[in-house]
């Protein structure tokens, strides 16, 4: 009894010495927070994130209104990252071409009205080097294989001879005669661009009618135009093959010109069979004609096409300053490992850990397009899903933070951001609208797939950013070729992970030099904008400075992205789909680059961070994605897919005729090449 009384007394003493209940609650809260922070740091591998109770904060307008907002603990962007290696690439002598020549168009034997149109409408007086070498040869009626750097004026090099020869025919061309010239191009956008150039050249010669055929347009309308008559026909291969098989009014008995522009790209996209069908159809009705093949790069596939389409051709290469080469095969084999790059093009590379890729890309866009005047940028991605995801993400985050500058370090004004997108899953009407809008815009950021990498002349593009590394040096050349066109200055940036640094040496082996930009220099732009300054409790600004401040602002920007992605289950699902698309595209690099871009080298948790995901999806693993991407479709279900095509599938590929699903076409091409291609896997062009 006595012991029980003493125990009760000690209990009351402890109780009387303890702090009040409110104080005890605060102490326990602080201890719990510290324990939570330690646990989060200890278990961080992209899998543990703590959610804190709601707290009050002042809104951005500053009107004193208080709201409840959950504070989510995000893992550090600057911890557990792989070490960034030093680049020790060998400096090589790049192949150069002289873009302009001193000769003017007046020196050529052209119709005076055609020369006047070139000078006044196209605003060109002097020829480029490739035009100087090509136009006289083509006016002589010779077949030709033309190779020159991107942006050197190859389109005009064949358009001028075609218009000159057709207007000079003694018997005046009638619209009802049908095609006299056939031009094949790989993409719809290039078809529109070539059609626009021909249309301008034909202003003095109204009796010659140009026309364009491409997937995505109404086949009935195209049949009506063919019935009325088209004298210069520009088309994508898939659509033309469809009309050859189904349109009775399409005849080639008067064909005098057959031109294949971007010949290597047409073959890369699997159109070799379509080209064979077209050549057979033309040969069946007209044996005598002039054939021209053009491209910025020559491949082994082009040499095969030379064998079946050209007769005693002239090889024109500005790079080697050789004309009238007797054997185009030898020229092609010599030039396979070297590429001509415009002298006015500056090339850069930056090594960025996977977790920081998204923040680094956003910071670079802000640096060039918000804080610098008259900047126009194209960002290349590996798939349509990546384009759509980043377009939506930047549209709802960066635009909301690109208002009036508040920092004293800002220039007198910042420039509004404008985002556009272009890829093969868009409807043709929207693609055409975006193409024209970006072409006529002075500023803007175009997010796109490789559909925009070939032949397109997009004026005043100052920066090319390759967020997804190209699958070949030739693809790299065509991407950066969208800038520094016709003597203008331009720059390019290639974003690589530390494990991909060896790709720089791969480019150097093809005589391509790139200079390194440090990631810290790109992220430093965030110090110019107080929108990304971290705020502590009580709406007090962080007092950090230097590198620490930049890290804090990068974390704030990453938090903005993650908050948007996790704002709805739909966005989370969209981010996961984009992540899966990225990994599948990553698995399609050719075998010679597998040692650099191997899917097993990816840290899925870190890669997920670059998609605004706080956790790597549990049902996503490297082996699962690889297995799904290589899985062959069930033979019994193949027929059902053909019978139940939805409208979205009809317009799946920018290169198709528009009458069959892109996935079905990929599978057909895969069978011809002995490959196993799944419906959801990106094609060999990874668009």
Curated annotation (Swiss-Prot):
> Which residue ranges does the UniProt annotation give for the motif Q motif?
103-132
Q: What is its EC number?
A: 5.6.2.-, 3.6.4.13
Where in this chain does the record put each Helicase C-terminal domain?
A: 344-523
Q: Where in the cell is it found?
A: Nucleus, Nucleolus
Region annotated Disordered, chain positions: 1-63, 625-687
Respond yes or no to whether keyword Nucleotidyltransferase is given for this record: no
Which InterPro entries does this chain map to? DEAD/DEAH_box_helicase_dom (IPR011545), Helicase_ATP-bd (IPR014001), Helicase_C-like (IPR001650), P-loop_NTPase (IPR027417), RNA-helicase_DEAD-box_CS (IPR000629), SPB4-like_CTE (IPR025313)
Query: Chief localization class?
Result: nucleus
Q: Which spans does this entry mark as compositional bias, Basic residues?
A: 628-644
List cellular component terms (GO). Answer: Golgi apparatus; nucleolus
By its UniProt entry, which SUPFAM superfamilies does this protein fall under? P-loop containing nucleoside triphosphate hydrolases
Catalyzed chemical reaction(s): ATP + H2O = ADP + phosphate + H(+)
> Which biological process annotations from GO are given for this protein?
ribosome biogenesis
- Annotated Gene Ontology MF terms? ATP binding; ATP hydrolysis activity; RNA binding; RNA helicase activity
Task: Give the UniProt keywords, A-Z.
Answer: ATP-binding, Helicase, Hydrolase, Isomerase, Nucleotide-binding, Nucleus, RNA-binding
Sites where the protein binds ATP:
148-155
Annotated motif DEAD box, positions: 261-264
Per UniProt, residues of the Helicase ATP-binding domain are: 135-316
Its annotated function is as follows: May have DNA helicase activity and RNA helicase activity. Probably have ssDNA and RNA dependent ATPase activity. Plays a role in ribosome biogenesis and TP53/p53 regulation through its interaction with NPM1.
Q: Which family does it belong to?
A: Belongs to the DEAD box helicase family. DDX31/DBP7 subfamily.
Q: How does it assemble?
A: Interacts with NPM1; the interaction prevents interaction between NPM1 and HDM2.
Would you tell me the protein name for this molecule? ATP-dependent DNA helicase DDX31
**Organism encoding this protein:** Mus musculus (Mouse)
Q: What is the lineage of its organism?
A: Eukaryota, Metazoa, Chordata, Craniata, Vertebrata
